[in-house]
């Protein structure tokens, strides 16, 4: 698709359609705090292994991902920091580090028309990792991603590279 054919609203709809098969989605119309949050997606998985009967459990593991989708005309460093901090704080409230918790990902995703160099640099260099009880109760990573309409680009931080393929499919389909 050529440069900037899809609007941010169309990209948001395509993204939510891609997430809806696996994630619980909560949409936001307009917020009192003027945060450009459009949707919050939650993913939960519980796995366990047992022998013969469920009482003879060998292990169990909980995995979670919390995606916060923001939409802005221009992504600046200030907007990035404000939204990233919000996603981190809200995501940490949802994490329950306990025996059996393996990992949780907090993923702020930005849909924007343009992105400043400072914001791009901050997004790509974002590294937030937290281990709970020396990783006995799991860990948390922050994955960041931005879908930039100008130039049909997708950028992520190192931990968010797994999301890049999904985002590129959304942008180019």
Stretches with model-predicted labels:
Residues 69-74, 110-113:
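Structural motif
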Residues 63-66, 103-107, 142:
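Short, surface-exposed beta-edge/turn micro-motifs
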Residues 125-173:
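Charged, structured surface patches that assemble and position nucleic-acid processing machinery
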Residues 96-102, 128-132:
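Arginine/glycine-rich "motif VI" loop of SF2 helicases in the C-terminal RecA-like domain
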Residues 53-56, 91-96:
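Short, charged beta->alpha transition segments
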Residues 75-89, 93, 117-121:
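Active-site-adjacent loop/helix micro-motif of nuclease/hydrolase catalytic cores
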Residues 1-72:
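N-terminal, charge-rich interaction modules
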Residues 98-123:
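Nucleic-acid nuclease catalytic cores
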């Amino acid at each position: 698709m050529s440069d900037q054919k899809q609007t941010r609203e169309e990209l948001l709809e395509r993204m939510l359609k891609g997430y809806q098969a696996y994630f619980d989605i909560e949409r936001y119309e307009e917020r009192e705090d003027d945060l450009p949050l459009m949707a919050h997606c939650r993913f939960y998985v519980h796995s366990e292994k047992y022998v013969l009967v469920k009482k003879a459990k060998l292990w169990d593991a909980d995995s979670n991902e919390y995606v916060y989708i923001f939409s802005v005309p221009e992504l600046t460093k200030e907007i990035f920091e404000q939204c990233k901090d919000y996603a981190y704080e809200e995501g940490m409230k949802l994490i329950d580090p306990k025996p059996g918790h393996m990992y949780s990902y907090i993923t702020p995703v930005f849909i924007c028309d343009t992105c400043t160099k400072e914001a791009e640099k901050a997004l790509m260099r974002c590294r937030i990792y937290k281990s709970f009880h020396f990783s006995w109760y799991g860990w948390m990573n922050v994955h960041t991603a931005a879908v930039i309409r100008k130039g049909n680009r997708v950028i992520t931080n190192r931990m968010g590279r797994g999301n890049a393929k999904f985002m590129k499919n959304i942008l180019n389909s």
